[in-house]
A protein has these predicted regions:
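Short acidic, glycine/serine/threonine-rich helix-capping segments at coil-helix boundaries
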Residues: 1, 18-30
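C-terminal catalytic/motor cores of large multi-domain enzyme assemblies
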Residues: 6, 10-17, 29, 34, ...
Length: 293
C-alpha cells in the first residue's frame, strides 16, 4: 500500500501493521498522521477496520465442537500478538533472576508517606534501573544493521495492563528526574493509559521497559522484550524472607527482579552486572533523591 517514509518509520517504531491503517482520503496514501490516528484508536479501545482480507477460520477439533466464544486477534490485541511473536522470533532472548533487599526502600517510603505522598515501589525500581542504564550503556541499546547502537539517554517504558491488552507509555529522560518527579510522571502516564488519553509522544522513543506482576503474587517471570529495545525488567511481589546474615537469623523484605535481554547485544555477565547495580541502588535509595549526573 502507498505510504510516506515518515509513516513507515513510525509504524516500524510502534510495531504497527500498515495493512491495518486506513489510507488518508485526501493524500490517497498512508501518512504519519494516519498511523497516529490508528494508534489513538487502539488506545481508546476501538478496532479500526482492516484493509486486508481476512483468512478463513480454522476448523475446531471434534472435541471442541460445542458453543465457544472467540476473541478476535484484531485491534490492540492483534498488534500485541504480532509484536510479541516477532520479538521472540527475531531476538535471542533469555532471562536471569536476582533478589533485591527492599528494607531500605520500605523505610524510605514510610518516611515519605508521613510527610505526604510517596512513590510506589515500582517507581523506586524504575529510578534505580534508569541510573543503572547510565552505568551499563550496553543495556540501553538497539540492534541496527551496523551493530549495537548505544543510546545516549534512558527513556524507560512502563507496562500498563488494560482490559484488552498491554500498553507501554514512556517516562522521558528517566535518569534526569529525581524520585518525586518520576513518581508524578509515572502516575500521570498510568492514569492516561487507563482512561485512553495518552498522546503519541507518550508512546514514542522508549529505550528500556519495566513490567510489574507483583500485585498478582508473582515472584519471577520471563517478560518479552519490547522491540527495538534489547532488554526488559520484570518486577515481582514484595515478600518477607527468612535470611541468615553474619550468623544471625532475621526477616528481610525482598523482591525478585527478572531481566530478559537480547543475547545478540550483550552476554550474561554484563546483564548480571546491570541487575546487581539495580539491587545496590535499592539497598541505598538516598541516591535516587537527585537526578543522575
Amino acid at each position: 500500500m502507498p505510504a510516506t517514509a515518515a509513516a513507515r518509520a513510525l509504524a516500524d517504531l510502534l510495531g504497527i501493521d500498515l495493512a491495518q491503517v486506513p489510507v488518508d482520503p485526501i493524500e490517497q496514501r498512508i501518512t504519519k498522521e494516519s498511523v497516529a490516528h490508528h494508534v489513538r484508536s487502539l488506545i481508546a479501545g476501538a478496532a479500526p477496520p482492516s484493509t486486508s482480507p481476512e483468512s478463513a477460520p480454522s476448523a475446531l477439533p471434534a472435541a471442541l465442537q460445542e458453543p465457544t466464544r472467540t476473541i478476535r486477534l484484531s485491534g490492540m490485541r492483534g498488534t500485541i500478538a504480532k509484536r510479541m511473536h516477532d520479538s521472540l522470533r527475531q531476538m535471542a532472548q533469555l532471562t536471569l533472576f536476582m533478589d533485591a533487599d527492599m528494607d531500605a526502600v520500605v523505610a524510605d517510603r514510610s518516611a515519605r508517606k508521613e510527610s505526604g505522598t510517596a512513590p510506589s515501589f515500582t517507581d523506586y525500581v524504575i529510578a534505580a534501573a534508569a541510573r543503572a542504564l547510565g552505568q551499563h550503556p550496553l543495556v540501553n541499546s538497539q540492534i541496527t544493521d551496523d551493530g549495537v547502537a548505544l543510546l545516549p539517554t534512558a527513556h524507560v517504558g512502563m507496562a500498563v495492563a488494560l482490559d484488552d491488552g498491554l500498553i507501554v507509555p514512556v517516562i522521558r529522560d528517566t535518569a534526569g528526574r529525581d524520585l518525586s518527579s518520576l513518581s508524578v510522571e509515572s502516575s500521570r502516564l498510568a492514569q492516561a493509559a487507563r482512561d485512553g488519553s495518552l498522546e503519541l509522544p507518550d508512546l514514542e522513543g522508549g529505550t528500556f521497559s519495566v513490567s510489574t506482576l507483583g500485585m498478582y503474587g508473582v515472584d519471577g517471570f520471563t517478560p518479552v522484550i519490547n522491540p527495538p529495545n534489547t532488554a526488559i525488567l520484570g518486577v515481582g511481589r514484595l515478600r518477607d524472607d527468612v535470611v541468615l546474615t553474619d550468623g544471625e537469623v532475621g526477616v528481610r523484605t525482598r523482591l525478585t527482579l527478572s531481566l530478559t535481554w537480547d543475547h545478540r547485544a550483550f552476554d550474561g555477565a554484563p546483564a548480571a552486572a546491570f541487575c546487581k547495580s539495580i539491587v545496590d541502588l535499592l539497598g541505598d535509595p538516598s541516591a535516587l533523591d537527585a537526578p543522575a549526573s
